[in-house]
């Protein structure tokens, strides 16, 4: 399976934004070695925003293009549909619920069969979670200190489209997320412009 192989901190510094949320990711960044302060062409800005979103969700170019094409077929605002589709990937929802401390770790958990959707094991990270779907950490993995700590430590962090049940180690996507509810700092409109040429 193909992977994004850029070192995470280096990639964050190159894009000029902490896409992985790690406190040390931007530590070595300066105005000289980050994008901040550099003048970009319109194409450069579009490309940068695409790289931000792709890297944040950990999807490859071919995968990303499929999401863009699907969004362009919708009658809704293309950028909103694009981000909503990426946000509703199973690996991302597992991360948002708090089973993992990164999307990368959540993807690994899905691949290894640690996550259930409506009681059934799903090992496809790109699986599209629908409103009403119940995402659960399999019972035998709830005793894993790392997974349990991840989940319980995020009690204060909540999103309006996810409802958590800490007793059952589960979360429900209660509705499709709106753009202003999705916690990602990116300009998806520039991405749509890039692919509309």
Swiss-Prot record:
GO terms for molecular function: rRNA binding; structural constituent of ribosome. GO terms for biological process: ribosomal small subunit biogenesis; translation. GO terms for cellular component: small ribosomal subunit. Residues 88-151 form the S4 RNA-binding domain. InterPro entries: Ribosomal_uS4 (IPR022801), Ribosomal_uS4_bac-type (IPR005709), Ribosomal_uS4_N (IPR001912), S4_RNA-bd (IPR002942), S4_RNA-bd_sf (IPR036986). It comes from the Bacteria. The keyword Cell inner membrane does not apply. Keywords: Ribonucleoprotein, Ribosomal protein, RNA-binding, rRNA-binding. The keyword RNA-binding applies. SMART domains: Ribosomal_S4, S4. PANTHER family: 30S 40S RIBOSOMAL PROTEIN, SMALL RIBOSOMAL SUBUNIT PROTEIN US4M. One of the primary rRNA binding proteins, it binds directly to 16S rRNA where it nucleates assembly of the body of the 30S subunit. Part of the 30S ribosomal subunit. Contacts protein S5. The interaction surface between S4 and S5 is involved in control of translational fidelity. NCBIfam families: PRK05327.1 (NF003717), rpsD_bact (TIGR01017). HAMAP family: Ribosomal_uS4_B (MF_01306_B). Belongs to the universal ribosomal protein uS4 family. This is Small ribosomal subunit protein uS4B. It comes from Clostridium botulinum (strain Langeland / NCTC 10281 / Type F).
């Amino acid at each position: 399976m193909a992977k994004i192989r850029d070192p995470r901190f280096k990639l964050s510094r190159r894009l000029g934004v902490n896409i992985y949320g790690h406190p040390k990711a931007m530590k070595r960044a300066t105005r000289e070695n980050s994008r901040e302060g550099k003048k970009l062409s319109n194409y450069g800005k579009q490309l940068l925003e695409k790289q931000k979103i792709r890297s944040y969700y950990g999807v490859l170019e071919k995968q990303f293009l499929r999401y863009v094409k699907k969004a362009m077929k919708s009658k809704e605002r293309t950028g909103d549909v694009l981000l909503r589709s990426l946000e509703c990937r199973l690996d991302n929802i597992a991360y948002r619920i708090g089973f993992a401390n990164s999307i990368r770790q959540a993807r690994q958990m899905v691949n290894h069969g640690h996550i259930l959707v409506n009681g059934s094991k799903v090992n496809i990270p790109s699986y599209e979670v629908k409103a009403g779907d119940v995402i659960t950490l399999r019972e035998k993995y709830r005793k894993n200190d790392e997974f349990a700590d991840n989940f319980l430590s995020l009690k204060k962090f909540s999103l309006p489209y996810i409802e958590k049940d800490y007793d059952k180690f589960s979360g429900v996507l209660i509705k499709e997320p709106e753009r202003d509810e999705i916690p990602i700092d990116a300009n998806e409109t520039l991405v749509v412009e890039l692919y509309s040429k």
